[in-house]
Amino acid sequence: LETPGEEVDNRSLEEILSSIPPPPPPAMASEAGAPRLMITHIVNQNFKSCAGEKILGPFHKRFSCIIGPNGSGKSNVIDSMLFVFGYRAQKIRSKKLSVLIHNSDEHKDIQSCTVEVHFQKIIDKEGDDYEVIPNSNFCVSRTAYRDNTSVYHISGKKRTFKDVGNLLRSHGIDLDHNRFLILQGEVEQIAMMKPKGQTEHDEGMLEYLEDIIGCGRLNEPIKVLCRRVEILNENRGEKLNRVKMVEKEKDAVEGEKNIAIEFLTLEKEMFKKKNHVCQYYIYDLQKRIDEMKTQKEKIHEDTKEITEKSNMLSNEMKAKNSAVKDIEKKLHKATKFIEENKEKFRQLDLEDVQVREKLKHATSKAKKLEKQLQKDKEKVEELKSIPAKSKTIINETTTKSSSLEKEKEKEEKKLKEVMDSLKQETQGLQKEKEDQEKELMGFNKSVNEARSKMEVAQSELDIYLSRHNTAVSQLSKAKETLITASETLKERKAAIGEINTKLPQTQQELKEKEKELQKLTQEEINLKSLVHDLFQKVEEAKSSLAMNRSRGKVLDAIIQEKKSGRIPGIYGRLGDLGAIDEKYDIAISSCCHALDYIVVDSIDTAQECVNFLKRHNIGVATFIGLDKMTVWAKKMAKIQTPENTPRLFDLVKAKNEEIRQAFYFALRDTLVADNLDQATRVAYQKDRRWRVVTLQGQIIEQSGTMTGGGSKVMRGRMGSSVIVEISEEEVNKMESQLQKHSKQARRIQEQKVQHEERVVKLRHSEREMRNTLEKFAASIQGLSDQEEYLTVQIKELEANVLTTAPDKKKQKLLEENVSAFKKEYDAVAEKAGKVEAEVKRLHDTIIEINNRKLKAQQNKLDMINKQLDECASAITKAQVAIKTADRNLIKAQDSVVRTEKEIKDTEKETNDLKAELKAIEDKAEEVIKKTNAAEESLPEIQKEHRNLLQELKVIQENEHALQKDALSIKLKLEQIDGHIAEHNSKIKYWQKEISKIKLHPIEDNPVETVSVLSPEDLEAIKNPDSITNQIAILEAQCHEMKPNLGAIAEYKKKEELYLQRVAELDKITSERDNFRQAYEDLRKQRLNEFMAGFYIITNKLKENYQMLTLGGDAELELVDSLDPFSEGIMFSVRPPKKSWKKIFNLSGGEKTLSSLALVFALHHYKPTPLYFMDEIDAALDFKNVSIVAFYIYEQTKNAQFIIISLRNNMFEISDRLIGIYKTYNITKSVAVNPKEIASKGLC
């Protein structure tokens, strides 16, 4: 339902809707007389080019211009305001804050700078007058220090940047989008934004307008609600499927439930009768047991005399056994002494071998060390000769390097002479080039003047024709829009009709293809399962055939005799007649040598096989006769083992019970352990020793000896499945069947892929048709309204074209004036072009002369430098060789000393080993003497032991005679006990049968208990067989029914689950509908808010651009007219007398005018009290500068504009001039009121 890592907003609908903020209120009213914010003055203290305290202002309430020469510090005024408003140092054209502190020759080591911006709220009055709102004055300041830290103050109190930002935003200063701020070169970028941001964090025209209009606050809630609706739809679909599935399962079980209830009714009657019969049998058996117990008490009286005689013989037996134990201890002690001495001798023998090996190794080592000493001495002599050779190389190379240095000085002098000669050669060409460049500068001045006259004449003509051209353009555009709307309306109505026809057909075909795809999928699963099983069988058959072929010649000959029928009783090799898990392969291969024995039916068959092998001289083999294996049948039962370790025999799977007996003969009670530690624990138990093998093939015998292990282990002597005799023809037949089904599976898979592709296409087509149908149906009404509106608008525009028609005579006069100026411009431009071409030719000639003569001499000098580098490298290598030889000589001498020491140590070791060998030989001689003495005294002890055993045998024979009599009596008792036990067993059986009887509840009826009959009732039963017959009839009826008793509980469970699933579906459906309605309402609210603001802004933009360009046109277009948020907003402009263009294709001046028109339109929609603009008129000609200046002065009377400008058309119209000038590296300012000066006649 949700992608991994996705965070889903799980808030309730009420919480999501309540978290949406209300539409932002306007920062200030656009009506006259409304209060607004203005800057009174700015105080700079040691900020950038200002030293000490400098006051800028006072600023006018409407239009102030900052003027001054380049480099005087005009832009620092903007920087000071940016500094206070919290911008980073890089935005203020500095790398860090400390750079903002003033630094000049007169003022050094200043530790801080401060900027204060003073604000007040006013109400405009007539002219330049205004009323200050009481207590509205406040001052925001920021101080930066040398350590790049800064602090903020509001009206003298220390505050954080967040407090400053909140205060300025509350008064309408847009710090988030910087609409109040247009820096140098940034005016064009406003209108050049992309229609829509390309990424989540990118901002395009759509996002820019959304933030201003205020509907951007709805974006996140819409996304949250959309995602929640998607998740709820997916959850609801899942719940609906579950309801349908449970309902289907419930209906399917109902029939079986009814049969089960009928069955339980019959079973209840049968159990009641069975209960009566079982109680009768228990009662009858108990009577017989009581009679046998009386008989048993009489026999016990006859056993007392035999018991007394047995006790006497038992005491005598104990005495003799004690004597036997004493003599056995003495015998054991003598035997143990002999064994210990033999073991000592074996140990000494082993030590003797080890010492002799060490002695041999020491002798060999001494010879090797002698050879190594000789090599080390030769190496010392070689290293002593290296320094002399290296010094000879250094002397020769140093001499060669000195001669090359002298040659280098000569070549460098030659290079300098060549360079001096080139300078004199090109002197005349340089003079001629400078004269031509001076002439070109004069021509350029004439070209600029001619171009200016031509553009002024063209502007006058454009202004005169602008109203008529605008009217004609609007009429043409309205007609084109009407045609487009009518055609679109007609096309969409036709498309709706076509979709309504095709959609049902597509849906029907999709259902059919989905059914066929489901059928093919099931068929593919079945075929793949069949192919997989066949493949395994073929592989097993091939493996069996290969194993049969790889048998030895003896086994092969015996099997051949079996197949021919000459010796019919042969089964085969024992390992091939059984199977074991691959985990135990190594264990059984290591511990069971009998796996290669050949199994036959009898000893006679085995003898026939032996005779056959001898007769044909094939070899020998060991045989197992199954007729002799029956003795092991009783021991094959499961046994209790230490730590429940598995018995290897129990893990073997054999063909039949007879073969299992042969495997027990081969394995007996051998256990298999995981590792050697467990095997050791299991093998040595107190009461018994076990034969144990590990999974790694290590074996512990019952005697305690351990074998196996090592790097090579035995494996593969027994397979994981019983080998079946199979012919090559059968294998071929199975392979043919496998190929047939594999081919069929591939064909089904290809059909499935084709159907899947078709289903995907049909689903996509159905979805596309549904989306298109919804989209077209929604747009029909809008297109109809647009068609009616445009018909009325065209009539109005046709009347407007007639009223704005120009005077033909005046138009012709202006056009002739433009043509005359153009001819004058073309003539001057042609002369300037010829002079410019001559300057380029002279420049190229000078460059070519320099390159030709300088190259050869430079190559000679480079070759000498290369040889000097090679000499230096050779000297360095020789010096390194001298140093290395000294170090290596010390190492070689150390090696000689070390080798001589090792030779001495080896001689000492050899002597020590010879002495040790002599000591071992002496100890061995003493051990042999002690062993011989003990063996001489052993026969006398053994004779005494045999006499005691003979006496013990006589006592045992007497005891056996008594035991025979006791056994006869015991057998009688056991016979009686056997009958009693048998009757008790039958009683337990019938009691168990009664305990099994449980009367099941039928539907909601209470559970009945089983009745207990009294002795009188049981005696009254004369014929239990008739009840048994009735039970048999009822059992037959029940057996024929074959009900599913679980169907009752399953039906109840399904019914409960069905009701639960329906309740869950209703709940999630209601929740989904609420979220979907809220989602649609928010989308409509966002669209309505955006389009209301958008129409106001685009209409004002059109009006502003027409006014600024005197006839041009501009508008904000929806890229997708049906959904403004899908593709964004495109800014299109039609400059005067030009076609419609995208903003990116305009000239610099046209982009500036377009951007300013948009800025003033946004100001009209959402007024901002302050605007700071830095040289926004840089790309405009004098006419457009005047138009922009008059517009600012006349149309924006409800805001304060502070503009940096160098164009007199701009600053002469302003209400207040702030002059900036710099003397002695310090910026100063002066405020002038132009109107006041003009009124006094001072200008």
Swiss-Prot record:
Record localization: Nucleus; Cytoplasm; Chromosome
InterPro entries in the record: P-loop_NTPase, RecF/RecN/SMC_N, SMC, SMC_hinge, SMC_hinge_sf
SMART domains: SMC_hinge
Chain segments carrying region Disordered: 1-30
GO molecular function terms noted in the UniProt entry: ATP binding; ATP hydrolysis activity
Domain SMC hinge: residue ranges: 568-682
N6-acetyllysine PTM positions: 336, 634
Coiled-coil segments: 225-546, 721-975, 1062-1090
SUPFAM superfamilies assigned to the protein according to its UniProt record, in alphabetical order: P-loop containing nucleoside triphosphate hydrolases, Smc hinge domain, Tropomyosin
Major subcellular site: nucleus
Residues given in the record as ATP binding sites: 68-75
BP GO terms, sorted: cell division; meiotic cell cycle; mitotic chromosome condensation
Family of this protein: Belongs to the SMC family. SMC4 subfamily.
Subunit-level organization: Forms a heterodimer with SMC2. Component of the condensin complex, which contains the SMC2 and SMC4 heterodimer, and three non SMC subunits that probably regulate the complex: BRRN1/CAPH, CNAP1/CAPD2 and CAPG.
Function: Central component of the condensin complex, a complex required for conversion of interphase chromatin into mitotic-like condense chromosomes. The condensin complex probably introduces positive supercoils into relaxed DNA in the presence of type I topoisomerases and converts nicked DNA into positive knotted forms in the presence of type II topoisomerases.
Protein name: Structural maintenance of chromosomes protein 4
Organism of this sequence: Microtus arvalis
